[in-house]
Curated annotation (Swiss-Prot):
Any one GO molecular function term: proton-transporting ATP synthase activity, rotational mechanism
Keyword Translocase: yes
Lineage, opening ranks: Bacteria, Pseudomonadati, Pseudomonadota, Gammaproteobacteria, Alteromonadales
UniProt source species: Shewanella baltica (strain OS155 / ATCC BAA-1091)
Protein's UniProt name: ATP synthase subunit alpha
EC identifiers of the protein: 7.1.2.2
């Protein structure tokens, strides 16, 4: 075979003409240590706090410690195959998650990836998980209610749209049950819900999703999951991820509700990460910024004014306020609300619902302790009729608790004290409510009206529940227009009071309970 020098020359010229100069600039580093989901990287420059670092196999880590000669990052996912010498590179991006209406009815992980087997998500865009909370001028006062469907909560500890109300108690006291019932009660209210499960068993979360679906509330809800078996980084970031998904609706002039179940486990995950990053431990071995961990999250729950919404949507939505209501859950140990994380979250939130083990075990469910449960801003948002009628409920229960303790040592009681005890024990019985059975405003109003106006005096204690069920059935059939009026307006007038009284008198005369 003879080589033609002209052909070779032409071929070389052609290659030279077609040659393109491409320069790629990459900020690349090398892993120098791997341990328990934490990697230490040498050689990276210009890294941002919280920046995503790309690892081999389409995985990412988040830069948390920026030191003089190395970067400490936490791996989001499996890390067993990472070793010293592996090359990694910066992305120049902060972690973002998909947001939009396409996520409603779906179960996603911390990164917004679907894990329910229903195919890809049709999201409207992406939002950073760390967002600065709206400022003072951008906010509006809380004056619209979020109905949980629980008489004990809506009457004594009302929650408003844009409020942060802590649900606190020992394990197995009904904290998750209360939050799930609050979500179920929103299915026809227009409030979009986000349920964030942190560090829970996968079987427990599957049961929650099934219950939401059974009661028709899943279509209105986004479920964000970071199970107990997932990396600590994913458990730490899950609440921020869910919050961004809820803010999507708030910023567009809609109302949303988010449940963090629970922030104790998030704090434990963050403590684990911080100790592995060799940050100095403080009280209970938590890092120094554990307060900021929760405050920057819960401050994002707010009610924003119409100007903020109009500016955010560039004029597409006008005259509408938006809200994100938060129900964080904290698990206490042996009822100790003075521990580090519980006191932090109590000081950040606008009130707390304290659930007690003793009350739960005695059959009072929801096991709300009205003595130390409080809502600091919800009173302004309470429905008119419930606010008007429920004034005596908290007083009756407080007096009953005091007298019940006193009566154990007193041999004989006067008639007034005995009447107060009788009334208190019946109101306590009336506050009991089954799970997955949230009540409408009208049903709550009728129930509380019967207690306030003395209709329970003649009812035997063990028949209070039957009396209430029969009364509500009677009112819904015989006084349907009145019940609809109360549900629609929430007003309380002399005419409504007269009709309620007439209905109750008529029902009591039937003796059908």
């Amino acid at each position: 075979m003879q080589l033609n020098s002209t052909e070779i020359s032409d071929l070389i010229k052609q290659r030279i003409e077609q040659f393109e100069v491409v320069s790629e600039s990459r900020n690349e580093g090398t892993i120098v240590a791997v341990s328990d989901g934490i990697i230490r990287i040498h050689g990276l420059a210009d890294v941002m706090q919280g920046e995503m670092i790309e690892l081999p196999g389409n995985r990412f880590a988040i830069a948390l410690n920026l030191e003089r000669d190395s970067v400490g990052a936490v791996v989001m996912g499996p890390y067993a195959d990472l070793a010293e010498g592996v090359k990694v590179k910066t992305t120049g991006r902060i972690l973002e998650v998909p947001v939009g209406r396409g996520l409603l009815g779906r179960v996603v992980n911390t990164l917004g990836e679907p894990i329910d087997g229903k195919g890809p998500i049709d999201n409207d865009g992406y939002s950073p998980i760390e967002v600065i909370a709206p400022g003072v001028i951008e906010r509006q006062s809380v004056d619209q209610p979020v109905q949980t469907g629980y008489k004990a909560v809506d009457a004594m500890i009302p929650i408003g749209r844009g409020q942060r109300e802590l649900i606190i108690g020992d394990r197995q006291t009904g904290k998750t049950a209360m939050a799930i019932d609050a979500i179920i009660n929103q299915k026809n209210s227009g409030i979009k819900c986000v349920y964030v499960a942190i560090g829970q068993k996968a079987s427990t979360i599957a049961n929650v999703v099934r219950k939401l679906e059974e009661h028709g509330a899943l279509a209105n809800t986004i479920v964000v999951v970071a199970t107990a078996s997932e990396a600590a980084a994913l458990q730490y970031l899950a609440p921020y991820s869910g919050c961004s998904m809820g803010e999507y609706f708030r910023d567009r002039g809609e109302d949303s509700l988010i449940v963090y179940d629970d922030l104790s486990k998030q704090a434990v995950a963050y403590r684990q990460i911080s100790l592995l990053l060799k940050r100095p431990p403080g009280r209970e071995a938590y890092p120094g910024d554990v307060f900021y961990l929760h405050s920057r999250l819960l401050e994002r729950a707010s009610r924003v004014n119409a100007i903020y919404v109009e500016k955010f949507t560039k004029g597409a939505v006008t005259g509408k306020t938006g809200s994100l209501t938060a129900l964080p859950i904290i698990e206490t140990q042996a009822g100790d609300v003075s521990a580090f994380v519980p006191t932090n979250v109590i000081s950040i939130t606008d009130g707390q619902i304290f659930l007690e083990t003793d009350l739960f075990n005695s059959g009072l469910r929801p096991a709300v302790n009205p003595g130390i449960s409080v809502s600091r801003v919800g009173g302004a948002a309470q429905t008119k009729i419930i606010k008007k009628l429920s004034g005596g409920i908290r007083t009756a229960l407080a007096q009953y608790r005091e007298l019940a303790a006193f009566s154990q040592f007193a041999s004989d009681l006067d008639d007034a004290t005995r009447a107060q005890l009788e009334h208190g024990v019946r109101v306590t019985e009336l506050m009991k409510q089954k799970q997955y059975a949230p009540m409408s405003v009208a049903a709550q109003a009728v129930s509380i009206f019967s207690a306030e106006k003395g209709y329970l005096k003649s009812v035997e204690l063990n028949k209070v529940g039957n009396f209430e069920a029969a009364l509500l059935s009677f009112m819904n059939s015989e006084h349907a227009p009145l019940m609809k009026l109360i549900n629609d307006t929430g007003d309380y007038s002399a005419d409504i009071e007269a009709e309620l009284k007439a209905g109750l008198d008529k029902f009591v005369a039937t003796q059908t309970w």
